[in-house]
């Protein structure tokens, strides 16, 4: 009977877990819808920012201004890279499947790839899970910040990028990339790697949906060409990180929703299996008791 009690306890425990995972799935689904809407609106802004870059550069080209002196811009094919900063974004919480693991694996792969080319790599981390992993494994992370990937904030992202931009402009790094797990759709995510500094001409023109941003600049901005580009570049870099944070959060909710759905289904299957085991054990116990009763009756005859 002790075995039956143990199985009953397990069934009760699994059912409680099932209720929790189902509730977490519903919460993640609700949060995902909101995050998806924010990501969609933010993407529209990012596309318009790209369109502004395109328009400014095309106007400069039409005016015969080919030599851009701004340090934010480089022809990537001619650029010699010796130092790279990798900004990675992970979640502050777990229970989201391979969301964090996949990002960390990509960071490690990129780091090894650069090191094989004798390129120095520095890491800058956003998100508790990633920062904890690298700290535990003795891998240095230059800048760490938590509670930003779970609550994207433009001012905090802007503050984080100030040091990054300062290091780039002062020559402490030649290239800055962002690695994060991005939202693809309700049931899938994808690892995204984006170079944000320097801003190469190909990066500016990489947008595959030009029809979404056909508006052009109609007024002539004041200031030199490089001042205009520097001002736009600062916004571009800051918003690139902010959009990556929003995109990552939507992907995180998507991954957690899937993970909790899988956990709920697994709990259902486990309850069925345990129930079958319980019924078998109960039947065996009843059979054993009947045999013992019959044996006792026979002994009294």
Swiss-Prot record:
Sequence intervals crossing the membrane: none
Compartment annotation: Cell inner membrane
UniProt-listed InterPro entries: ATP_synth_F1_ATPase_gsu, ATP_synth_F1_gsu
SUPFAM superfamilies in the cross-refs: ATP synthase (F1-ATPase), gamma subunit
One Gene Ontology biological process: proton motive force-driven plasma membrane ATP synthesis
Family as reported in the entry's similarity comment: Belongs to the ATPase gamma chain family.
UniProt keyword annotations, A-Z: ATP synthesis, Cell inner membrane, Cell membrane, CF(1), Hydrogen ion transport, Ion transport, Membrane, Transport
PANTHER family per UniProt: ATP SYNTHASE GAMMA CHAIN, ATP SYNTHASE SUBUNIT GAMMA, MITOCHONDRIAL
CC per GO annotation: plasma membrane; proton-transporting ATP synthase complex
GO MF: ATP binding; proton-transporting ATP synthase activity, rotational mechanism
Subunit structure: F-type ATPases have 2 components, CF(1) - the catalytic core - and CF(0) - the membrane proton channel. CF(1) has five subunits: alpha(3), beta(3), gamma(1), delta(1), epsilon(1). CF(0) has three main subunits: a, b and c.
Entry membrane topology: Peripheral membrane protein
Protein name per the record: ATP synthase gamma chain
Chain's role: Produces ATP from ADP in the presence of a proton gradient across the membrane. The gamma chain is believed to be important in regulating ATPase activity and the flow of protons through the CF(0) complex.
Domain of life assignment: Bacteria
Pfam family, one: ATP-synt
Signal peptide: none
Main subcellular location of this protein, as a coarse class: membrane
């Amino acid at each position: 009977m002790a075995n039956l009690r143990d199985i009953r306890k397990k069934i009760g425990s699994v059912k409680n877990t099932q209720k929790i995972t189902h509730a977490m799935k519903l919460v993640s689904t609700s949060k995902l819808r909101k995050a998806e809407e924010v990501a969609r609106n933010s993407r529209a802004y990012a596309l318009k920012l790209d369109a502004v870059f395109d328009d400014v550069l095309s106007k400069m080209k039409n005016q015969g201004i080919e030599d851009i002196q701004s340090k934010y811009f480089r022809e990537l094919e001619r650029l010699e890279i010796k130092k790279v900063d990798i900004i990675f974004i992970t979640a502050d919480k777990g229970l989201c499947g391979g969301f964090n693991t996949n990002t960390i694996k990509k960071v490690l792969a990129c780091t090894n790839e650069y090191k094989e080319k004798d390129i120095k790599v520095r890491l800058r981390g956003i998100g508790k899970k990633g920062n904890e992993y690298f700290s535990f494994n003795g891998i240095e992370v230059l800048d760490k910040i938590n509670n930003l990937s779970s609550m994207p904030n433009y001012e905090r992202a802007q503050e984080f990028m100030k040091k990054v931009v300062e290091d780039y402009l002062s020559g402490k790094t030649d290239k800055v990339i962002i690695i994060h797990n991005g939202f693809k759709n309700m049931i899938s995510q994808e690892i995204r790697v984006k170079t944000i500094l320097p801003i190469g001409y190909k990066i500016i023109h990489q947008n595959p949906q030009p029809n979404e941003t056909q508006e052009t600049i109609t007024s002539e901005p004041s200031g030199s060409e490089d001042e205009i580009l520097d001002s736009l570049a600062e916004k571009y870099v800051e918003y690139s990180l902010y959009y990556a944070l929003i995109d990552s959060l939507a992907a995180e909710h998507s991954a957690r929703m899937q993970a909790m759905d899988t956990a709920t289904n697994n709990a259902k299957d486990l309850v069925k299996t345990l129930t079958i085991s319980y019924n078998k054990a109960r039947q065996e116990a009843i059979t054993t008791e009947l045999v013992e009763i019959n044996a006792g009756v026979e002994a009294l005859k």
